[in-house]
Amino acid sequence: MTLTGCVDYYEIIAGTKVAVCRNAIDNKTVATAIAATRTVNGNDDPFVVMNVSTIMAKVIQWQRTMPRVAPCYAVKCNDDKVLLRTLADLGMGFDCASKAEIEKVIGLVGPEKIVYANPCKTRGFIAHAEAAGVKRMTFDSVEELTKIKQNHADPSLILRISVSDPTAQCQLGIKFGCDPETVAPKLLRKAADMGMNVIGISFHVGSGCNEPATFRTALEYARGLFDLGISLGLSMTLLDIGGGFPGVDTAHISLDACAAVINPALEELFPLDSCPDVEVIAEPGRYFACAAVSVTTNVIASVKVPASRITEKADDVNRDGYMYYMNDGVYGSFNCKLFDHYQPRGMPLAEHDADEPRFPVCVWGPTCDGLDQVEESSVMPRLYEGDWLYYPDMGAYTSVAASTFNGFDKPKTYYFIDEATLGSIVRKADSAPRG
């Protein structure tokens, strides 16, 4: 990549070349430089840009906002090796859901910093966790409890309860977690009878939480179950408040809004003076991954249609609208639209005058599937074949689930970081014990 005026030198992180800039720059600036070089070279392939500096900024924000809560990054959200290495260097733990995810991070951190947070595991995966030294794992049924006992000699168990935000982007309570009132007490008693080591309670209010008050409800249930567990002789030293934290702050939801509920609830229900041995962790994914990544695509066709075809308003039949076809779609980077209920919103990479006409547009991916629509109805300037579209905030549940359906390759990723942030990460990594 040629980024004249942007990149001063390169460093290798996780075996990958990362551009280092002496001054801080943003994703769009880097994407513009890459696109310009590609256009000159006749390369119109889509590409991804990851700003490693953004990852550290999110870590700092978390530590300032919820200092008592230690984040364990949800690997499922984005398993990019530069992202994982950066988070590990910054002292992060990891939430893993499978054997493969454990394998991705076991060389980065010690097994004590891994939570196997999948309440339904195969016997082989449980045995693998034992071999890898991973003890902390979740369960939500007597069947899973029995399975773990039969396949792991020394597990540290975390009971997952179901407390869900009904407005969350992705509902998880319908699949995982037991009822905190009717089932959870029975499972704690059963675990105690079986001589199993239950160390705490976990919950997940739903990926993409919109109602932070749900955290308070879940913490109240957790407090009651902690008390029961302690009365049964269980150690109860871990509280896992799950994920659901926003990747980008909006008028409706922010990390501050979540913290405004969580921090006082922890102080009231799990005060440090009476609960000094209770470790509080969380499982954020999109919070760390989303804003660091952008996707830039190329318009491969621009087709004029009656605007009514897009807006579905009969009055727009005589207005112009456009269907933009681009070379990445829902089978690639934009699978988040189908699987994560995310609504990507793109913009022209090139600047357009404010008084330039805007038109109703829909944006299609490149495959033959009619389902491959990234934006149903948006408003954009007139774009032409060969123009570039820029999509910010695309790091969560995107590349990790991308496919090569119809023979379309996954986009290449470019990485950059500013020099000051790189120095901070290196110093942090050098001062921390390596797992």
Curated annotation (Swiss-Prot):
<feature type="modified residue" description="N6-(pyridoxal phosphate)lysine">
    <location>
        <position position="76"/>
    </location>
</feature>
<feature type="active site" description="Proton donor; shared with dimeric partner">
    <location>
        <position position="368"/>
    </location>
</feature>
<feature type="site" description="Stacks against the aromatic ring of pyridoxal phosphate and stabilizes reaction intermediates">
    <location>
        <position position="204"/>
    </location>
</feature>
<dbReference type="GO" id="GO:0004586">
    <property type="term" value="F:ornithine decarboxylase activity"/>
</dbReference>
<dbReference type="InterPro" id="IPR009006">
    <property type="entry name" value="Ala_racemase/Decarboxylase_C"/>
</dbReference>
<dbReference type="GO" id="GO:0033387">
    <property type="term" value="P:putrescine biosynthetic process from arginine, via ornithine"/>
</dbReference>
<keyword id="KW-0456">Lyase</keyword>
<comment type="function">
    <text>Catalyzes the first and rate-limiting step of polyamine biosynthesis that converts ornithine into putrescine, which is the precursor for the polyamines, spermidine and spermine. Polyamines are essential for cell proliferation and are implicated in cellular processes, ranging from DNA replication to apoptosis.</text>
</comment>
<dbReference type="Pfam" id="PF02784">
    <property type="entry name" value="Orn_Arg_deC_N"/>
</dbReference>
<dbReference type="InterPro" id="IPR029066">
    <property type="entry name" value="PLP-binding_barrel"/>
</dbReference>
<dbReference type="InterPro" id="IPR002433">
    <property type="entry name" value="Orn_de-COase"/>
</dbReference>
<dbReference type="Pfam" id="PF00278">
    <property type="entry name" value="Orn_DAP_Arg_deC"/>
</dbReference>
<feature type="binding site">
    <location>
        <position position="397"/>
    </location>
    <ligand>
        <name>pyridoxal 5'-phosphate</name>
    </ligand>
</feature>
<comment type="pathway">
    <text>Amine and polyamine biosynthesis; putrescine biosynthesis via L-ornithine pathway; putrescine from L-ornithine: step 1/1.</text>
</comment>
<comment type="subunit">
    <text>Homodimer. Only the dimer is catalytically active, as the active sites are constructed of residues from both monomers.</text>
</comment>
<keyword id="KW-0620">Polyamine biosynthesis</keyword>
<dbReference type="InterPro" id="IPR022643">
    <property type="entry name" value="De-COase2_C"/>
</dbReference>
<dbReference type="GO" id="GO:0005737">
    <property type="term" value="C:cytoplasm"/>
</dbReference>
<feature type="binding site">
    <location>
        <position position="207"/>
    </location>
    <ligand>
        <name>pyridoxal 5'-phosphate</name>
    </ligand>
</feature>
<feature type="binding site" description="in other chain">
    <location>
        <begin position="339"/>
        <end position="340"/>
    </location>
    <ligand>
        <name>substrate</name>
    </ligand>
</feature>
<dbReference type="InterPro" id="IPR000183">
    <property type="entry name" value="Orn/DAP/Arg_de-COase"/>
</dbReference>
<feature type="binding site">
    <location>
        <position position="244"/>
    </location>
    <ligand>
        <name>pyridoxal 5'-phosphate</name>
    </ligand>
</feature>
<keyword id="KW-0663">Pyridoxal phosphate</keyword>
<comment type="similarity">
    <text>Belongs to the Orn/Lys/Arg decarboxylase class-II family.</text>
</comment>
<feature type="binding site">
    <location>
        <begin position="283"/>
        <end position="286"/>
    </location>
    <ligand>
        <name>pyridoxal 5'-phosphate</name>
    </ligand>
</feature>
<dbReference type="InterPro" id="IPR022644">
    <property type="entry name" value="De-COase2_N"/>
</dbReference>
<keyword id="KW-0210">Decarboxylase</keyword>
<protein>
    <recommendedName>
        <fullName>Ornithine decarboxylase</fullName>
        <ecNumber>4.1.1.17</ecNumber>
    </recommendedName>
</protein>
<dbReference type="InterPro" id="IPR022653">
    <property type="entry name" value="De-COase2_pyr-phos_BS"/>
</dbReference>
<feature type="binding site">
    <location>
        <position position="369"/>
    </location>
    <ligand>
        <name>substrate</name>
    </ligand>
</feature>
